[in-house]
Amino acid sequence: GHDWGDQYIRRTGQCLRDNTPAGTVCARLSGDEFLVLFHGYRSRDAVREKIDCLTKAMQQSVALLPSGNALHISLSGGIAWYPDDGQDWETLKKYADFAMYQVKHSEKGRVEEFDIGVYNREAYAERTRREFRQLLSNAQVFYCFQPIFSARSGRVVAYEALMRSDLPTLRSPATIMKLAREQGALYEIERLTFTKALETFDSLCRAGSVSGDAMLFVNSIANTCLSHEDGKYINSHWHELCRRMVVEITEEEEIDYEALERKRNAPGFSGMFALDDYGSGYSNENTLLQLAPRFVKVDITIIRGIDTSPDKQQILRNMVAYAHPRSMKIVAEGVETAAELRTVIELGADLLQGYFLARPAIVPGAIAPEAAGIIQELQRRKKD
């Protein structure tokens, strides 16, 4: 009870007083937290020696329980050094406190020195978590759109919606997804993705800033399904867009195919899937068979340098040979050079996406003139 707790704290205070040199300041801050100020020493090692002696003495000290049994006193502590860690009282106290709580959250019964690197990482991580909560509460994301072009005509046939955030620690979608998994917020991100992407793209359509009949590719979390109510809400607000929406799936974990079927049968959904990052090591043949996607997006690792790699060329050739008889279209994703563009078209890719053609933008632009010229040139050769 409280009396026993007070006795334990008094015994701890006595141990600190009895096992520190004269001139050492010992004070109780609150609860079971004490502060010890060592000063007047020539080196850190001299202080460390005193702290080591204090720790050993504390471990040998006992407090008697009401039952008569002895309980050894355990000490967890943190050290901050003047002037290297801080030059004022508040900073030193804050840093020593941080070091102590690092011990309490790992292996108790030790004394650790403050580490500015760990502190900065923890502070950054806490800021990131705080900004993630802010992102969810205020829907603080916006969308850029990257055009996807026909390999035959160079015409825009679709746009991929790409999530962005202005929050300083959440510029990367990968960071947002990592936090969503850690904090059990995948559903909230899935709902935010669909509502914001469709809302933004609808505004672009109304303004005439995008091709009016183009499809919209939206990245979805494989095993996360929107509720029936959220699905109905989305369909009622953006019914026409839902009929042109392609849901992109990346296999980053074992896929629940029942969840995919629920996605496929969502209210108003076109039923079109795209298998993203195919060939990256995540997406495999079983997923290709089970998902039966309308589009297969070939991973950038295969597209990069494909013009000089016979092995990569054979992989793409095999994928085209598998996809076309099954009414699947091959999307060459991450095309960044003229040589890559020529190669993927010659190997039979149906759709093209990448910086060489057009970069993602809030208001997406037209195909780059050089890329358009290459497509036209290759089509003329085919006709000839």
Q: Positions of the model-derived regions?
A:
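Catalytic-core segments of nucleotide cyclases and related cyclic-nucleotide turnover enzymes
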Residues: 2, 48, 67, 82-108, ...
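Alpha-helical scaffold within the catalytic cores of cyclic-nucleotide enzymes
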Residues: 13-17, 46-67, 94-95, 193-205
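Catalytic strand-loop-helix junctions within cyclic-nucleotide turnover domains
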Residues: 37-47, 65-70, 74-92, 117-121, ...
